[in-house]
From Swiss-Prot:
Lineage, highest ranks first: Eukaryota, Metazoa, Chordata, Craniata, Vertebrata
Organism: Xenopus tropicalis (Western clawed frog)
Chain residue ranges for the region called Cys-loop: 176-182
Function statement: Deubiquitinating enzyme that may function as negative regulator of the innate immune system. Has peptidase activity towards 'Lys-48'- and 'Lys-63'-linked polyubiquitin chains. Can also cleave 'Lys-11'-linked ubiquitin chains (in vitro).
CDD domains reported for this sequence: OTU_OTUD5-like
Variable-loop as annotated region, ranges: 231-241
Gene: otud5
EC code(s) of this entry: 3.4.19.12
Name this polypeptide is given: OTU domain-containing protein 5
Length: 518
């Protein structure tokens, strides 16, 4: 008879351990409810001990820096490998609650501990249980880390980071608006040149994730459709999954800088090329900014535009702006020249007018001076001048009606006396004189004087003498009904001209006959 050894009794069960194991199982089933089968999520940062990535996507550049504590190992949230394993980056988030919009690659240790305690454990809450399906531990721990940073130290660190990038790399950090879409704003600024295009970038990214859901769903802890719907909100932050999707979508590497001159992470696309990467900077574990290279145009690269040359549009616009500026300057100069020419012409006209006015005034002064100078003349000229002056005054003092009534039937005695009175010799002599002393001929037969040709009154002497004589004569003697100054002056001038011509003829005959007698 064979005696078999007795089995050892099982050790007494530990109620706490059983509770923990049962709680862990419940948490695992709860966290996986409705989720796709997936591999373990990758850690947030790359470490030397991580396995190599699969063949689809090139691995991110491993960096020794760490922006957050390393992920926890063990259980379903242990470190694993995946295409996003190397180069996984924490999200840009400002969420303070369990239901935040940010998501990262690793499980939250705090979440696992809270869930493993079970729903009836002390310290557990429905909010913590409801948020257990989110993808990133930063949704729970970012607020605590942010509050622990000293504002002065953070400001100095930001200043040093910006200065180091500009001095060593020549890059400029372009600030993005802090509204939850900073990652998409930074990418939109790099691709479209306008951060307000972040909604378009977000939509394209979410559509790309949905088309490749069989691949990207392996790196999301929650239901993938729920994750995509949450990420479509404009105030929901992005993380490393969106970076990888945008790197593949635009076929441009995505470089992430965090307080250093070398990128701490690089996300590569499916195909390698020489295109300029999309550069973003990560600040205080909560915010992304755009890093711009001012010496190289990158806007439009990755949009699939045929025959597109970065910066060509800017060069064309610059040439057009320069040409427009030159044309405007030329037109302005031409307008100024026209204004100056117009002013010059107006100035010349004003000067000429002023000179003419002054010359005319000077001529009037000279005429007045010459008229006031005493004239040297013979006795005949003096008597003729006196008679002419008295006759002119008397003639001008009488009105035309008085002059016309001199020969009217109302004064027959005066008319007869005037008709019987012979004209004076001086008047007879003056009738034979030429009307102007400037006319050719013997102008100095009766009166000689140096100032006779220049005096303005000399030319009036014949007219004055004629008027003195005509005022004593009746208009009927000349076949006129009444005296008319214009007709009388015309007739007198005609008679004077005829007498002047006769005098010239006589003087010519005398000159011709004088040589014969000699």
């Amino acid at each position: 008879m064979t005696i078999l050894p007795k089995k050892k009794p099982p050790p007494p069960s530990d109620p706490e351990g059983n509770g923990e194991r049962s709680g862990s199982g419940g948490a695992d089933s709860h966290s996986r409810s409705g989720a796709r089968p997936r591999s373990s999520p990758p850690p947030r940062w790359a470490y030397p001990g991580n396995p190599a990535p699969p063949e689809r996507h090139p691995a991110g550049t491993p960096r020794p820096q760490q922006a957050s504590p390393p992920p926890c190992s063990g259980g379903s949230g242990g470190a694993g490998s995946g295409p996003l394993g190397e180069g996984a980056l924490g999200p840009c988030c400002c969420c303070t609650g369990a239901g935040g919009c940010c998501s990262g690659p690793g499980h939250s240790k705090r979440r696992r501990q809270g869930v493993s305690a079970g729903p009836g454990a002390p310290g557990s809450s429905p909010d913590r249980e409801d948020g257990a399906g989110n993808n990133s531990e930063d949704e729970y721990e970012t607020a605590a880390r942010t509050q622990a940073i000293d504002p002065d130290t953070a400001e100095q660190q930001e200043h040093w980071f910006e200065k180091a990038l500009q001095e060593k790399k020549g890059f400029i950090i372009k600030q993005m608006k802090e509204d939850g879409a900073c990652l998409f704003r930074a990418v939109a600024d790099q691709v479209y040149g306008d951060q307000d295009m972040h909604e378009v970038v977000r939509k394209h990214c979410m559509d790309y994730l949905m088309k490749n859901a069989d691949y990207f769903s392996n790196y999301v802890t929650e239901d993938f459709t729920t994750y995509i719907n949450r990420k479509r909100k404009n105030n929901c932050h992005g993380n490393h999954i969106e970076m990888q999707a945008m790197a593949e979508m635009y076929n441009r590497p995505v470089e992430v800088y965090q307080y250093g001159t070398e990128p701490i992470n690089t996300f590569h696309g499916i195909q390698q090329n020489e295109d300029e990467p999309i550069r973003v900077s990560y600040h205080r574990n909560i915010h992304y900014n755009s890093v711009v290279n001012p010496n190289k145009a990158t806007i439009g690269v990755g949009l699939g535009l045929p025959s597109f040359k970065p910066g060509f549009a800017e060069q064309s616009l610059m040439k057009s702006a320069i040409r427009t500026s030159e044309e405007s300057w030329i037109e302005q100069q031409m307008l100024e020249d026209k204004k100056r020419a117009t002013d010059w012409e107006a100035t010349n006209e004003a000067i000429e007018e002023q000179v003419a006015r002054e010359s005319y005034l000077q001529w009037l002064r000279d005429q007045e001076k010459q008229a006031r100078q005493p004239r040297k003349a013979s006795a005949t000229c003096s008597s003729a001048t006196a008679a002419a002056s008295s006759g002119l005054e008397e003639w001008s003092g009488r009105s035309p009606r008085q002059r016309s009534t001199a020969g009217s039937p109302e004064h027959p005695d005066l008319h007869a006396e005037l008709c019987m009175k012979p004209p004076s010799p001086a008047a007879t002599l003056m009738l034979g004189k030429p009307p102007s002393p400037c006319a050719p001929g013997p102008s100095n037969q009766t009166c000689a004087g140096a100032d006779r040709a220049t005096s303005p009154l000399v030319s009036l002497y014949p007219a004055l003498e004629c008027r003195a004589i005509m005022q004593h004569m009746s208009p009927t003697a000349f076949g006129l009904k009444d005296w008319d100054d214009d007709e009388i002056l015309a007739s007198v001038l005609a008679v004077s001209q005829q007498e002047y011509l006769d005098t010239i003829k006589k003087s010519t005959l005398r000159r011709d006959s004088s040589p014969d007698h000699s």
